[in-house]
Design a protein with these regions (language model features):
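An N-terminal structural lobe/cap that precedes and organizes the functional/catalytic core
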Residues: 1-89, 95
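Short amphipathic alpha-helical surface micro-motifs
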Residues: 3-5, 56-58, 111-115, 191, ...
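Intrinsically disordered, low-complexity boundary segments flanking structured domains
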Residues: 21-26, 116-118, 197, 204-206
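Internal, well-ordered alpha/beta segment that forms a basic, Gly-enriched binding/recognition surface
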Residues: 28, 56-144
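Alpha-helix initiation/capping motif
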Residues: 30, 41, 123, 153-157
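Short alpha-helical interface elements
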Residues: 50, 100-104, 108, 152, ...
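C-terminal, charged low-complexity interaction regions
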Residues: 144-221
Length: 221
């Protein structure tokens, strides 16, 4: 069974319902129809059901739901479809980490000896944008503006929207960081965990910490 855990401050994370404005509306050309965007890409997971924890309706317990239940009307059809390459990049990275763990499990059972070096490639820019898209999805229409340039509660800045759609890039020290240390324990399972980084002095989402199939990443906005 796959897992998704969401960790936002109390009262600021949930499954959204009803017709809501597309969070990429600043790009223009919105479709008339809203789509049901998966908060976390369904293509990551091999199974149809997920174990979910940390949302408003399951704060104190783990609940099993179908992937289709973790959706929200926060993107129009056009802008949802335009993010398909980003979903693919996230799914391919997730599958790569899964394969790395599978091969490691096989080799751990073999006798000591020479091993061929196996190299893997991941679309780093695509994965960075997948994390950004997912952060926006999970924080959309919640209690804080998303990013330093946003003045609207629960909405991303225009710059972040453009980055998510490959129309811009992070500047200075903003962007995606890999978090690791020697001796760090990694539990590589089909799990995604998210916790936002919230600025208290000027309340807004400044970034997020992700555990992505056991690998820790920091996205700084």
């Amino acid at each position: 069974m796959s897992d998704i855990q969401g960790c936002l401050e109390k009262g600021h994370l949930g499954i959204y319902s009803g017709s809501m404005r597309c969070w990429a509306a600043c790009l223009g050309d919105c479709s008339d129809k809203m789509s049901r965007e998966h908060l976390v890409s369904a293509s990551l997971f091999l199974e149809g059901n997920l174990k979910v924890q940390g949302f408003d309706w399951c704060k104190g317990e783990t609940v099993e739901v179908g992937i289709a239940g973790l959706t929200a009307k926060i993107l129009c059809v056009k802008h949802n479809n335009d993010l398909s390459p980003i979903d693919t990049a996230g799914a391919q990275a997730f599958a790569t980490f899964r394969e790395i763990r599978r091969l490691a499990n096989v080799r751990e059972k073999q006798k000591p000896g020479y091993r061929n070096v196996k190299r893997y490639r991941i679309d780093g820019i695509g994965l960075e944008r997948w994390f950004l898209k997912t952060l926006i999805n999970l924080c959309c229409d919640r209690g804080y503006p998303i990013g330093r340039g946003s003045q609207i509660v629960g909405r991303p800045s225009d710059d972040l929207v453009r980055i998510a759609y490959s129309l811009g890039s992070f500047r200075d020290k903003a962007g995606l960081y890999f978090v690791a240390r020697v001796g760090m324990k990694i539990e590589s399972t089909d799990t995604v965990i998210f916790a936002p980084l919230v600025q208290k002095d000027v309340p807004r989402v400044e970034g997020g910490l992700f555990v992505f199939r056991g690998q820790s990443f920091l996205l700084f906005l």
